[in-house]
């Protein structure tokens, strides 16, 4: 027995047989040990053949184990188990060797062991019974005319079934979603496949536009016989390149697998069309020192027309891999797959609607499909239709399905309340005082009411769930019947087709309508139901908002109120700048109502004015109002961009420079957070060439970064602040605080001297901030003191400042040329520092209120007014 004349699988089975003998303490390797090991081998051909012959493999394996247990085990020292081969096991190998010669093979393989076991082993004979001829046929089919010329022949057996999937068969079994549209591309593919030579189309398009769907559409047409005669008997196999490469342990094993696949395709005489998704992976696949890659192995067959192949890849990968190999490129014919428009996407979604309804057990409204196409096109800019729209619908269905499986919010709240009351009840039962007894009585009454409410809600939920389950079951039956109708029509089974089309399907549709009507009558409108089973455009909007951070869902009442009073909210934080506040809040309201220009940012403003009048504060307060946090503001200090080359930091370093992979500070921030306030602070400090980058943002709402990716700025508010013309404003402002026309012209003259006309012309508005008046200062004092009180709240201390003291603070700190900042410093010196000293010295208890007054000497006095109990 020469172990080197056996395949790796047989060698592995013998090794496992030795281990089995050691476990059973047997000196000899028995035939059952070898056969049990062969049956349990990973990816066992022995097991695979028996399973296809409908042999009970588990029972056969148990029979082998039982037989092994009947052999006498040997106990003792220095006994070597599994060192010898039994007479019957030796006969098995000898007989297998004779089968090897009969098949004209070079190595003993698993099928030889199986044939030998069928002749020699009584246990195997008993289970195989009268299926010997069936097994012989299966072995013949699996081998496919191949000879065992290597120690790993299994890779050559049924290579296509192992490393690919039959798309035509999947269509017949109804496993594939329908393909809607793409008729021109499918026809183009069919034309190329019908050529004599170079009949290999390659589908090129962006990720998610439907390249794989075109091949699935071709498979569906083949099943429906809606193809030219030359393609009627064809089948489409999708090659799984990762499976082809995975587990190829030995040198040349990958090439052997690929050759086996290509041999099957070639021997099919053009009946098999090979589909290779991500075909660029062929270039370089399996490449080792001195070995050919997969691409070079395909070239001869492609050129001769022996291999019918459809490839699919993206534009970038085609350029990077295929175009570089011109010999491979010329053997393929390009089919460009463009992104469908919104109307085509809606048609595709309508075609898929029923499949998703049946899978998720929900109802999808048509307006949800329209919203998915339109919103994904407008807001999800880094992906392509129809993929992103289909994902939206799928996610929305999954969301509703998840909600259906859990308790509604109303019932959940009641359950929590009941649990809370029960815990309180058990605690009060241990108390003996009158107050506790009184509370216990009240609590038990409330608990009884809550339990009654809980039972009613639970009953209603169960009823709705039962009716929804009936609807889901009926929809699934209808879907199965429609699939059966397609199969019957394809197979020309007219009697069955007529029965389904005119009997079963109309009856199921009628029953489904009745169930839906009853459900509608009993449960009322969708909004009245405890459990929602309908996907609407609101769910689609919510998911777009989750993915992008852009609020596109319908306005809820709280948000509606917030938007209508946005200017009031901003006025509380920004004092004395009514025009600026109104302009910014109006821009946000226009955008949220959906009537802004969809190709430009929400708003772009240039704020001009002296320092400390609220330019930056307005941007911060806007971010806080819209997003409940100032962190959503992208702040770029333009004083960092004083050099001409600093523009690369905004959009990213060019190729070859350090930091190219990191992206730009502005572009990456907006890509991560497309709905935000962008504050370009102190723009006059930046180099003038930096503003050329802003031209595209302000006009088209987009910017291309250093990697060539387009970043969407259409949902941002761009605010620039500058001190240009502030001296003119300070010198010429009226006593009322109004800015005169001549002052405005003088400021604009200063502005035109600094900014290019094309920048200024693209701004929505240039807003002049007026210097702060004495009246404004008193309001700012209130604001500063409110913030101080918020900080003191943590220590349970509060401060009250008299009106006289407030007026004095505003008057003393008033410096028009510096705005509100001197006031903040003045309050720090006059109130915060003395207060801090008192707190450290005296250590106020919680609940202390400190009153600040102004005495006759114009000095502030601090008195501890009261202590709350």
Curated annotation (Swiss-Prot):
Region (Linker): 340-549
Keyword Heme: no
Region of interest: Disordered: 447-468
Source organism: Staphylococcus aureus (strain MRSA252)
Residues the record lists as binding ATP 1: 205-212
Renumbered residue ranges of the record's region Repeat 2: 85-145
Name of protein: Chaperone protein ClpB
Subcellular location: Cytoplasm
InterPro entries per record: AAA+_ATPase (IPR003593), ATPase_AAA_core (IPR003959), Chaperonin_ClpB (IPR017730), Clp_ATPase_C (IPR019489), Clp_N_dom_sf (IPR036628), Clp_R_dom (IPR004176), ClpA/B (IPR001270), ClpA/B_CS1 (IPR018368)
Repeat in keyword set: yes
Domain Clp R residues, every copy: 3-145
């Amino acid at each position: 027995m020469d172990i080197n004349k056996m395949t790796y699988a047989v060698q592995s089975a013998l090794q496992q047989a030795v281990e089995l003998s050691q476990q059973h303490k047997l000196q000899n390797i028995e035939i059952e040990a070898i056969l049990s090991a062969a049956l349990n081998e990973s990816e066992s051909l022995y097991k695979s053949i028996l399973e296809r012959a409908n042999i009970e493999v588990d029972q056969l394996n148990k029979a082998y184990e039982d037989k092994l247990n009947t052999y006498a085990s040997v106990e003792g020292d220095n006994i070597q188990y599994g060192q010898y081969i039994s007479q019957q096991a030796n006969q098995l190998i000898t007989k297998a060797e004779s089968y090897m010669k009969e098949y004209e093979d070079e190595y003993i393989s698993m099928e030889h062991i199986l044939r030998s076991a069928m002749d020699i082993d009584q246990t195997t004979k008993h289970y195989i019974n009268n299926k010997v001829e069936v097994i012989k046929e299966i072995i013949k089919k699996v081998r496919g005319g191949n000879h065992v010329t290597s120690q790993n022949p299994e890779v050559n057996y049924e290579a296509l079934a192992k490393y690919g999937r039959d798309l035509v068969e999947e269509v017949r079994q109804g496993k594939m979603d329908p393909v809607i549209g793409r008729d021109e591309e499918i026809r183009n593919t069919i034309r190329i496949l019908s050529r004599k030579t170079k009949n290999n189309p390659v589908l090129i398009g962006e990720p998610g536009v439907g390249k794989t769907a075109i091949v699935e559409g071709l498979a569906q047409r083949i099943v429906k016989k809606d193809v030219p005669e030359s393609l009627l008997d064809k089948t489409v196999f999708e090659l799984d390149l990762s499976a082809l490469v995975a587990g190829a342990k030995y040198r040349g094993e990958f090439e052997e697998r690929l050759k086996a696949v290509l041999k099957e395709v070639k021997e099919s005489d053009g009946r098999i069309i090979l589909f290779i998704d991500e075909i660029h992976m062929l270039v370089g696949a399996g490449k080792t020192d001195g070995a050919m890659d997969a691409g070079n192995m395909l070239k001869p067959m492609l050129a001769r027309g022996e291999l019918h192949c459809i490839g699919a890849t993206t534009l970038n990968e085609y350029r990077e891999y295929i175009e570089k190999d011109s010999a491979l490129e010329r053997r393929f014919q390009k089919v460009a797959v463009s992104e469908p428009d919104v109307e085509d996407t809606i048609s595709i979604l309508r075609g898929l609607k029923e499949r998703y309804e049946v899978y998720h057990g929900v109802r999808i409204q048509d307006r949800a499909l329209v919203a998915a196409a339109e919103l994904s096109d407008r807001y999800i800019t880094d992906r392509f239709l129809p993929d992103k729209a289909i994902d939206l619908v799928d996610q929305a269905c999954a969301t509703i399905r998840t909600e259906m499986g859990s308790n509604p919010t109303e019932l959940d709240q009641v359950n929590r309340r009941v649990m809370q009351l029960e815990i309180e009840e058990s605690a009060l039962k241990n108390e003996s005082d009158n107050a506790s007894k009184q509370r216990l009585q009240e609590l038990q009454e409330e608990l009884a009411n809550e339990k009654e409410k809980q039972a009613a809600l639970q009953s209603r939920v169960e009823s709705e769930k039962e009716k929804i389950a009936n609807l889901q079951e009926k929809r699934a039956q209808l879907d199965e019947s429609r699939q059966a109708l397609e199969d019957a029509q394809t197979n020309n089974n007219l009697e069955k087709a007529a029965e389904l089309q005119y009997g079963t399907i109309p009856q199921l549709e009628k029953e489904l309508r009745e169930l839906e009507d009853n459900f509608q009558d009993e449960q009322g409108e969708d909004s009245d139901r405890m459990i929602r089973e309908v996907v609407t455009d609101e769910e689609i909007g919510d998911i777009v908002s989750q993915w992008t951070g852009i609020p596109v869902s319908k306005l809820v009442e709280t948000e509606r109120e917030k938007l209508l009073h946005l200017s009031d909210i901003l006025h509380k934080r920004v004092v004395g700048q009514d025009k600026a506040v109104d302009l910014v809040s109006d821009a946000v309201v226009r955008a949220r109502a959906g009537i802004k220009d969809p190709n430009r940012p929400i708003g772009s403003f240039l704020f001009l004015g002296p320092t400390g009048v609220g330019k930056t504060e307005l941007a911060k307060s806007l971010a806080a109002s819209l997003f409940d946090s100032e962190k959503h503001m992208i702040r770029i200090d333009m004083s960092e961009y004083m050099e001409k080359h600093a523009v690369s930091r905004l959009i990213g370093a060019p190729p070859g420079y350090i930091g190219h992979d990191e992206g730009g500070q502005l572009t990456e921030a907006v890509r991560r957070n497309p709905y935000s306030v962008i504050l370009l602070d102190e723009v006059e400090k930046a180099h003038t060439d930096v503003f050329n980058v802003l031209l595209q943002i302000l006009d088209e709402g987009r910017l291309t970064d250093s990697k060539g990716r387009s970043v969407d700025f259409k949902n941002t508010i761009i605010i620039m602040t500058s001190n240009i013309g502030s001296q003119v404003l300070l010198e010429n402002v009226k006593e009322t605080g109004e800015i005169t026309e001549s002052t405005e012209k003088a400021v604009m003259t200063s502005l035109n001297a600094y900014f290019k006309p094309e920048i200024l012309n693209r701004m929505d508005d240039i807003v002049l901030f007026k210097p702060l008046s004495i009246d404004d200062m008193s309001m700012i004092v209130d604001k500063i003191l409110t913030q101080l009180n918020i900080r003191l709240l943590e220590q349970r201390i509060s401060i009250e400042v008299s009106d006289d003291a407030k007026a004095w603070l505003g008057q003393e700190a008033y410096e028009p040329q510096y705005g509100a900042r001197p006031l903040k410093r003045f309050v720090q010196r006059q109130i915060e520092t003395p207060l801090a000293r008192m707190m450290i010295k005296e250590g106020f208890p919680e609940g202390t209120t400190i009153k600040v007054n102004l005495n006759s000497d114009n000095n502030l006095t601090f008195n501890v007014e009261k202590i709350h109990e």
